[in-house]
Amino acid sequence: MSKSTAEIRQAFLDFFHSKGHQVVASSSLVPHNDPTLLFTNAGMNQFKDVFLGLDKRNYSRATTSQRCVRAGGKHNDLENVGYTARHHTFFEMLGNFSFGDYFKHDAIQFAWELLTSEKWFALPKERLWVTVYESDDEAYEIWEKEVGIPRERIIRIGDNKGAPYASDNFWQMGDTGPCGPCTEIFYDHGDHIWGGPPGSPEEDGDRYIEIWNIVFMQFNRQADGTMEPLPKPSVDTGMGLERIAAVLQHVNSNYDIDLFRTLIQAVAKVTGATDLSNKSLRVIADHIRSCAFLIADGVMPSNENRGYVLRRIIRRAVRHGNMLGAKETFFYKLVGPLIDVMGSAGEDLKRQQAQVEQVLKTEEEQFARTLERGLALLDEELAKLSGDTLDGETAFRLYDTYGFPVDLTADVCRERNIKVDEAGFEAAMEEQRRRAREASGFGADYNAMIRVDSASEFKGYDHLELNGKVTALFVDGKAVDAINAGQEAVVVLDQTPFYAESGGQVGDKGELKGANFSFAVEDTQKYGQAIGHIGKLAAGSLKVGDAVQADVDEARRARIRLNHSATHLMHAALRQVLGTHVSQKGSLVNDKVLRFDFSHNEAMKPEEIRAVEDLVNAQIRRNLPIETNIMDLEAAKAKGAMALFGEKYDERVRVLSMGDFSTELCGGTHASRTGDIGLFRIISESGTAAGVRRIEAVTGEGAITTVHADSDRLSEVAHLLKGDSNNLADKVRSVLERTRQLEKELQQLKEQAAAQESANLSSKAIDVNGVKLLVSELSGVEPKMLRTMVDDLKNQLGSTIIVLATVAEGKVSLIAGVSKDVTDRVKAGELIGMVAQQVGGKGGGRPDMAQAGGTDAAALPAALASVKGWVSAKLQ
């Protein structure tokens, strides 16, 4: 009996654990501190800084099953999903890693043992082929002489991409940095399937399928292209879980493995589909995985960056559900079946199931309102099409008006063998794309490119002043030996009391100083293991190796500490008041305010906001001790410590506890006791995205300032109402009631005046071919009274055509009325349109009543004068 996908995942991790590897949990799909990457798309992403030497772990061997997304950006599989056997937006990458530990020999032997041993995967050895980089004789000989693979099944792959070291079998992180040859393992499905071995003209067939890529990082590529051997070479491997599951379960398509069969059946059930071979079922089964896990990792549907990619995937799934005949919202109903089929890998998703379902349901409902109209428009345009390409302007209109991502439009067109003019679409989108790029923060940032070999020791938990030594200087992202007065720079010290921005807490400000210089620190950021002090040299000069005194702005840090501790109390209070579905989706803690984004599906009620405030202030009055402990990550989670969205944690973590009320993982700076916070006040609650709310709050002196401001406002209002704050509500109610009564009386007077004006106007009507025509500009009449006057005049005049106008604040208001016995010859909508056009406006309405507005008051007399001639022509 073949292994299930869940069993294959566990077997892989168990095998490498038995070989001394640390089992590391999958990192978030949102890469940590890597603006170059849209989504986590490979197992090595979370170890990138380790390979670059910027981070150190307490293990040298690791194994993971990493959740990955490839949709948007450089790695984009979206358009192929549903049309091929192996493309997915979401997949799991099984990997084993060596950080300067074992190398080629052990990496190859481990792979061979796992794949072929009867205890593990037991694949037939004769079905396995391998490739090596053309000049990697070492790997070739290991495969041939130690493993025993015949020469005819070992294929050398050279530089096949037009440049030295540009090969399918040579991996590189970028233009410079760690790189090296790789060896790939292929499985031969048999000659009943078309395709040839790797490197052959038929290699794109489905007979020979790559199942494992083993990268040997043994060189450091220099800017001039030279390859320097790394002192401690490393190993990075990746094997797609879905691909190896297809091999072990003896199927040729990833969509035929147990995991997808179960999901496809669930999709069929919620959409009412009966043909299980329909490609739309495969699309939806794939898309629920990427969408659900992206939302669980904090991504929300939006029109920018990661949120827009998520929205595109959701809408593509909804459209395929529409094709299957789904009559109601269905997509969110697949989260439960997904959790069931993912097994232990779905535990994070299960904790957030209600939130994920609500976000998906809301997004589907919003898109459903425009989907049918958009598809109808697209059908109309395609029916009129004479060629085989839909113009970019129409594609953009579908996006702008109906929310159709261009790839969804392309999806529909492809089914009819029609292309989309994507260049034209991009031209129409360019301005919006430029704005999105600017807003995203994904633009150029010299400091983001800084790479520091040294590490900084943070001593800011216990010190606000400290002596240190300059270990590196950077100007515009480039290392320099010295800086002079007036230069902006990043200064790295061997030890520092300055806190670098992390966990939502902003970086410290302060001063680095010596006998002959002063450097104003405006921000503090992390660069790998180093801490960079960002600012400007105010006086003197500073060079690498200089001793400095580092002074943190103590008052600012104190305010930040209070706000950060209050954030923890509020998080716990929200979970008590609203429910345990609340989880952090983002935060900002500075010296003025704390901002907290959290999962919740509706606006908080006033009584809920008050309950959270009261609960936090109760903990402040308890004056609970705020304590920190260092412990293993798993032990901390077992203790109930909450981990924060978007943060990457080491194996040893700092656990912050506030009595029995709050326990979280946190590396930030905090008060000593909750009583130090003094007072907590929520100043706003709002929505930021579907299923995400935002609270802003203040503490300490900031909270007291808001109390004083509220008191001052109440005193001012009480003075204006000639009362005091004790009976202010009664005073306001009395004023409002009196105001409503006066407004009612005023409206009655206006109606009486309008009726009198109508009576006066009726005598000014003239006869045009047996119909009474009345055209008049009125002064001192509110625009909204014109309609009442027209109704009165129609009752008085019988067969009639009426045009009334008034000007208020430079804007023209027009209304036309036509008695029903005349509407077969004169229509009010046409008449008002003719007049409005002359005063720079437009309007419309029914044949018997229409209204309009305009901006050119000076043209009004001439426009009204033209009515008689126009009507006469119509009545002849």
Curated annotation (Swiss-Prot):
Cofactor note: Binds 1 zinc ion per subunit.
GO annotation, biological process: alanyl-tRNA aminoacylation; negative regulation of DNA-templated transcription
Gene3D superfamilies associated with the record: 2.40.30.130, 3.10.310.40, 3.30.54.20, 6.10.250.550, Bira Bifunctional Protein, Domain 2 (3.30.930.10), Threonyl-trna Synthetase, Chain A, domain 2 (3.30.980.10)
Obligatory cofactor(s): Zn(2+)
Keywords, alphabetical: Acetylation, Aminoacyl-tRNA synthetase, ATP-binding, Cytoplasm, Ligase, Metal-binding, Nucleotide-binding, Protein biosynthesis, RNA-binding, tRNA-binding, Zinc
PROSITE patterns reported in the protein's UniProt record: AA_TRNA_LIGASE_II_ALA
SMART domains, sorted: tRNA_SAD
Catalytic activity: tRNA(Ala) + L-alanine + ATP = L-alanyl-tRNA(Ala) + AMP + diphosphate
EC nos: 6.1.1.7
Function noted in UniProt: Catalyzes the attachment of alanine to tRNA(Ala) in a two-step reaction: alanine is first activated by ATP to form Ala-AMP and then transferred to the acceptor end of tRNA(Ala). Also edits incorrectly charged Ser-tRNA(Ala) and Gly-tRNA(Ala) via its editing domain.
Family: Belongs to the class-II aminoacyl-tRNA synthetase family.
Description of how the protein assembles with itself and partners: Homotetramer.
Protein name: Alanine--tRNA ligase
Biological source species: Escherichia coli O139:H28 (strain E24377A / ETEC)
